[in-house]
Regions:
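Outer-membrane beta-barrel porins/channels
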Residues: 1-295
Length: 295
């Protein structure tokens, strides 16, 4: 609760109906959030299918295709904690407000359990590799990810006693299907050493109207290098480094956010909804180590 000045003014008016002598706690809090919800839960095991086929056309060309099915990761008994600002004076005021009838829902949150599910999208991948000489190999992969399965996220806060819904935190996602392109090459220097280099472009499934800090939310451009050391006939050591950056230096967008406390206070849904805007950039350094044993 907090952040948007227009909504804060609406909420102050609603709160003062419950406590007419209420001081302006938003001014007292400054940039700090008055209340927040901390949700925690472990997803149940989900079962999916991976299937693929490889065709070695000749010694130079190979084609491949893989399919990965969609999974739905479900959380049925997550926990929730209602946290208030670390300020004794404001905390005392909030404690009194939570006793008001219109905020009775908030009183029941700490004993509620979290139920939600998150889809992991299906994907289709096509690949081709070309070996012009015994030492050189080049490859191209196209991966089509069916992100449209992630159209919304509903988090239900449920009373465990009678299994009734205390509150639903609903958010539209409206993800779009995406295409990722990966290209790379490797050179076998000798029996002991193989060197690799590559890059990929991974399209963002999120439109600017629904841009938020979650991942994946930006089109990513990555460069990779790696090598394989083969000290013995039965052991390979793989080392790799990748630099991931956003395709745009900075991406600007917004996300429709509904203030649930405003709705509880009786403010209409239209007034309780505002845009959470921001400018985003992303970069990462990745390192990997792999060991392959042959028997």
């Amino acid at each position: 609760v907090g952040a948007d000045n227009a909504q804060n003014q609406l909420l102050m008016g609603a709160l003062q109906t419950a406590m007419p002598t209420l001081p302006n706690i938003f001014e007292m809090a400054g940039d700090r959030s008055l209340m927040s919800l901390a949700l925690k839960g472990d997803a149940k095991m989900a079962v999916g299918v991976n299937a693929g086929i490889m065709w070695d056309i000749n010694k130079q060309w190979s084609l491949g295709f893989t399919y990965r099915s969609k999974l739905r990761m479900k959380v049925n008994s997550g926990s929730i904690a209602l946290k208030t600002i670390d300020d004794p004076a404001i905390g005392q005021i909030l404690g009194q407000l939570l006793q008001a009838p219109q905020f009775s829902t908030l009183q029941n949150l700490s004993s509620a359990v979290v139920k939600t599910e998150l889809p992991l999208p299906a994907s289709l991948t096509w690949g081709v590799s070309f070996r012009p000489t015994p030492k050189w190999e080049f490859a191209v992969d196209l991966q089509y990810v069916l992100w449209s399965a992630y159209d919304r996220l509903d988090v239900e806060l449920v009373n465990p006693t009678d299994n009734t819904t205390v509150m639903t935190l609903a958010s539209d996602k409206n993800y779009s299907n995406t295409l990722a392109v990966r290209i790379g090459g490797q050179y076998r220097v000798c029996d002991f050493l193989t060197a690799r280099m590559g890059m990929y472009v991974d399209e963002s499934p999120v439109s600017s109207d629904y841009l938020n800090p979650e991942t994946p939310s930006m089109t990513k451009l990555a460069y990779t290098v790696g090598l394989t050391l083969r000290p013995t006939r039965w052991l390979d050591i793989d080392l790799a480094y990748g630099y991931v950056n956003s395709a745009d230096p900075e991406r600007t967008g917004s996300y429709p956010y509904t203030n649930s406390v405003l709705e509880l206070a009786g403010v209409g849904a239209a007034q309780a909804t505002t845009d959470f805007s921001g400018n985003y950039t992303a970069r990462a350094h990745t390192f990997s180590l792999g060991l392959n044993f042959r028997f």
